[in-house]
């Protein structure tokens, strides 16, 4: 704490004289076409300064508060050739720079909004569906390099809950959009589909269990030019998964001055020592290659763990003596044994990431009518996660190995690779794009600080007797116990080949018809690799008490066995048609249709109609209706694993089996089919003045036959049925099901205002509010084999899953951000509101509600000649979520904070960042 305070005091003293002297200059001018007519809504950006402006109806623009220095000024507008100019700005000076843009029919240059319309408008407010655009400057001011966390701070419709004691999800966290599952959001990179992560979230907070999302944190944050979030169903345009919407990550391109960013921070919070120290280093360079460019980026992240666990009042030594602990504060009143407290871990794990990315673009002629392009990246992550503590007298422990008990750890190795490339050309008025993309994500389960209790207390020699209980016979496993294991691997692969064509047609309507057609071929693969033998085998040894067989498999995560191992793939062919045009001078219409055929479950057709009506120049009404679908994930169809759950305070072996497994069929499992959806939205965009925009959008999403991980069939009746059916070693069964329908209703409100502040300052105010309510409208009944029995279950979904779908995400989310710029000085303040939510834990299902919380973030900084220095705080006032009261929701008072908290439970984070231009 003191070190952090000294650091920030020093930085403030360094900044103070600079803040007092902050002035900056102004760039202003006019944008016109070749004939001198003014061009409205052209984007003018001062590259390197992070400042931009939009031209008004007279073509005029002004960028104020520009730090002294030289900049490349870029002006661009859809339908015109982009233009750049080099300007030098002095302190307090005003520079005039006009642009005359030449018209072109179809441009291959990137534009401001890609998703939402194949016609590619330049302003989100012009679209018939809501799209948020977050620039690199906005992304870089959040005090974190985690893209998922950045999006959650900027877009209230996105949720990115922190995870702890959730197996692999501790290390690869998914995000959700509009309260749906991670796999209901399609992620694109430069307009190409991004592959999903290999991990299946069988344990997760803030979302329904059993989905696989996209690991946004595998992309270097410094390589991102902007992120576009389409908040509307788009399966008819982009294919499976786009039920909640689309996130398009657009990477930086072109020649630019090399940069290097270094950010360091630490959590300094009440009642806990400083922890979670983080260092992030990222940089990039872009240089010309012939007519084109090549950009290279790299990033390294090191984050120490955080721990918010309280001491354990049940932790006893061999004499049976426990510490005396205050249950209201978690403080140790009297230390009465020599055991280390806390013995649990409740917080972020250690994380180390290395990431690279490259983006290449080469026009093949001077007119820029044809080009080749390529982009891709590689990332590698190692980290830690934890399970539940195993006490010294647990049947999962051997005192000879862990005299004081042990806390098992996940040490995964995660690799992610992607590559894409293609050819674009303008041919006879057609804009053609032929390309391919390949991506893979691999997750290795390495388990440490654990053991396989069934192999006995021996590390040097084999002492497990096998199934017959007699050491020395032929069924002995013949291997000693271990303290670490390779428990297996999951890998996901995806190959996509696509051809897209677009043309502007004159059909006698008030404006040309934008026609887009295309076809795609996709091949997906999902593989489970078995762990080493010692990680899954049952050695047959009795437990330390000599009464019952010891639990088999590496404790906390039993390895994938050979029977779990599999390698499955499928293919998909899709074709689409997209038409957009103005039917009148005020009414724009967009119609899209898509047909897809899957090799494993069949065919699906979807459609979309979107309308935009503009009764006045500054007011737009918009609405859309679409059908969508999501194909069953390969991991949902073929995942198989026996793992350890804490159910009713006991360790139970739970079998997660494919739906075609006989143990699943006993309880009514059926072959998975596609989810189908209907999405309706309506709203308006209002720009009463050039510096203010307000949007309001209502939405309703109905999903039928939704796929989720069903209830755990593990009560006494289910166990008897399993035993009678020949599955005596299985304590419980879970499988995936299409067994429910859901309805999601909500509204998004956004507002942006820019005003002058003083002689040379600028104040940008932005607000965003999201309300989302999920409701389960249908649940399948109990399987016939359980109907009429004394089972504890009431449906194929348990209460924990129902709460996870309907209540574990705040209904209300809102942000209010103020950004002030004056010369070299810049500052940012944000107020974020997270509404109340509810959560429950397995078996006991003690549903608890937690109140809403308000967090404050702040950042100030100063632009030096070649560097930008910033300091800031996330959660400035050290706000924590409410504490669970029920014994089984707080793990007997060792997990003191709500597990499903949407903003985590790490407390205040202080950071400093320096951004350097290397010229």
PLM region spans:
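Short, acidic Ser/Thr/Gly-rich low-complexity loop/linker segments typical of extracellular
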Residues: 49-62
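Extracytoplasmic beta-strand/coil segments of soluble accessory domains associated
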Residues: 148-198, 241
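Outer-membrane beta-barrel transmembrane domain signature of Gram-negative proteins
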Residues: 400-402, 406-419, 425-426, 436-438, ...
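Short acidic/polar hinge/loop motifs at secondary-structure boundaries
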Residues: 192-231
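Outer-membrane beta-barrel translocator/receptor signature
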Residues: 206-214, 222-225, 236-248, 252-319, ...
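N-terminal periplasmic accessory domains that precede
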Residues: 96-99, 147-154, 175-176, 188, ...
């Amino acid at each position: 704490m003191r070190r952090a305070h000294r650091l920030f005091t020093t930085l403030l003293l360094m900044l103070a004289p600079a803040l007092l002297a902050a002035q900056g200059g102004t760039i202003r001018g006019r944008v016109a076409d070749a004939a001198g007519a003014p061009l409205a809504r052209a984007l003018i950006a001062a590259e390197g300064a992070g400042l931009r402006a939009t031209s008004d109806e007279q073509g005029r623009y002004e960028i104020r508060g520009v730090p002294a220095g030289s900049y490349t000024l870029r002006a661009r507008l859809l339908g015109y050739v982009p233009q750049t100019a080099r300007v030098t700005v002095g302190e307090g000076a005003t520079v005039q720079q006009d642009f005359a843009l030449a018209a072109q029919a179809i441009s291959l240059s990137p534009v401001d909004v890609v998703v939402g319309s194949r016609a590619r408008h330049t302003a989100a407010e012009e679209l018939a569906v809501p799209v948020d655009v977050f620039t690199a400057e906005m992304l870089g001011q959040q005090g974190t390099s985690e893209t998922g966390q950045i999006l959650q701070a900027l877009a209230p419709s996105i949720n990115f809950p922190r995870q702890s004691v959730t197996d692999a999800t501790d290390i690869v966290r998914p995000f959700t959009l509009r309260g749906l599952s991670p796999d209901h959001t399609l992620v694109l990179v430069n307009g190409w589909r991004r592959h999903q992560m290999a991990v299946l979230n069988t344990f997760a907070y803030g979302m329904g269990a059993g989905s696989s999302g996209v690991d946004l944190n595998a992309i270097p944050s410094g390589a991102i030019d902007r992120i576009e979030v389409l908040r509307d169903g788009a399966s008819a345009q982009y294919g499976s998964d786009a039920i909640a919407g689309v996130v398009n990550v657009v990477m930086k391109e072109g020649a630019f001055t090399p940069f290097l960013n270094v950010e360091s921070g630490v959590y300094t919070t009440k009642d806990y020592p400083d922890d979670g120290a983080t260092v992030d280093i990222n940089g990039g360079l872009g240089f010309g290659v012939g007519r084109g460019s090549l950009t290279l980026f790299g990033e390294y992240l090191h984050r120490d763990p955080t721990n918010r666990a309280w001491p354990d009042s049940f932790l006893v030594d061999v004499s049976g003596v426990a510490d005396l602990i205050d249950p209201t504060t978690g403080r140790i009143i009297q230390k009465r044994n020599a055991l280390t407290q806390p013995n649990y871990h409740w917080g972020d794990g250690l994380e180390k990431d290395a990431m690279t990315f490259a983006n290449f673009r080469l026009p093949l002629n001077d007119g820029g009518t044809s080009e080749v392009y390529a982009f891709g990246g590689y990332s590698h992550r190692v980290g830690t996660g934890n399970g539940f503590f195993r006490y010294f007298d647990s049947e999962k422990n051997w005192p000879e190995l862990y005299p004081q008990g042990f806390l098992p750890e996940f040490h995964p190795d995660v690799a992610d690779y992607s590559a894409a490339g293609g050819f674009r050309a303008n041919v006879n008025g057609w804009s053609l794009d032929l390309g391919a993309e390949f991506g893979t994500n691999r997750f290795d389960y390495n388990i440490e600080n654990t053991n396989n209790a069934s192999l006995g207390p021996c590390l040097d020699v084999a002492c497990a007797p096998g199934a017959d209980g007699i050491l020395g016979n032929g069924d002995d496993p013949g291997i000693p116990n271990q303290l670490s294991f390779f428990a297996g691997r999951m890998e996901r692969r995806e190959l996509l080949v696509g051809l897209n064509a677009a043309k502007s047609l004159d059909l006698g309507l008030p404006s040309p018809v934008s026609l887009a057609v295309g076809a795609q071929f996709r091949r997906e693969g999902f593989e489970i690799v078995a762990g080493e033998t010692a990680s899954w085998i049952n050695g047959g040894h009795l437990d330390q008490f000599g009464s019952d067989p010891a639990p088999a498999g590496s404790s906390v995560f039993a390895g994938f066995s050979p029977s779990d191992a599999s390698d499955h793939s499928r293919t998909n062919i899709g074709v689409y048609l997209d038409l957009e045009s103005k039917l009148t001078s005020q009414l724009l219409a967009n119609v899209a249709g898509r047909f897809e055929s899957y090799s494993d479950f069949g065919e699906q057709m979807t459609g979309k109609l979107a309308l935009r009506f503009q009764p006045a120049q500054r007011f737009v009404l918009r609405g859309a209706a679409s059908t969508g679908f999501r194909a069953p994930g390969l991991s949902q169809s073929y995942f198989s694993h026996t793992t350890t759950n804490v159910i009713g305070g006991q360790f139970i072996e739970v079998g997660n089996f494919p739906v075609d497994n006989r143990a699943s069929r006993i309880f009514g499992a059926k072959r998975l089919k596609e989810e189908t959806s209907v999405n309706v939205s309506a709203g308006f965009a209002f720009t009463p003045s050039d510096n203010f925009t307000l949007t309001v959008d209502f939405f309703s999403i109905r999903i039928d036959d939704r796929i989720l991980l069903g209830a755990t069939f593990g009560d006494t009746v289910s166990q008897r049925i399993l035993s009678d059916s020949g599955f005596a070693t299985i304590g419980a069964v879970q499988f995936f099901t299409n067994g429910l329908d859901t309805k999601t209703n909500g509204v998004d409100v956004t507002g942006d205002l820019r005003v002058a502040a003083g002689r040379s300052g600028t104040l940008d105010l932005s607000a965003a509010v999201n309300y989302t309510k999920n409701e389960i409208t249908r649940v399948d009944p109990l399987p016939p084999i359980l109907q009429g029995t004394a089972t504890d279950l009431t449906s194929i979904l348990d209460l924990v899953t129902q709460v996870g779908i309907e209540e574990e995400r705040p209904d209300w989310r809102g942000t209010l951000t103020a950004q002030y710029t004056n010369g070299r000085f810049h500052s940012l303040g944000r107020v974020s509101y997270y509404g109340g939510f509810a959560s429950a834990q397995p078996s006991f299902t003690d549903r608890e509600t937690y109140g809403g919380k308000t967090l404050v973030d702040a950042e100030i900084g100063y632009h030096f000649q070649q560097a930008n220095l910033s300091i800031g705080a996330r959660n400035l006032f050290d706000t924590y979520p409410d504490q669970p009261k029920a014994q089984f929701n707080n793990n007997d008072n060792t997990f003191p904070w709500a597990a499903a908290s949407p903003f985590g439970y790490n407390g205040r984070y202080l950071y400093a960042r320096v951004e350097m231009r290397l010229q």
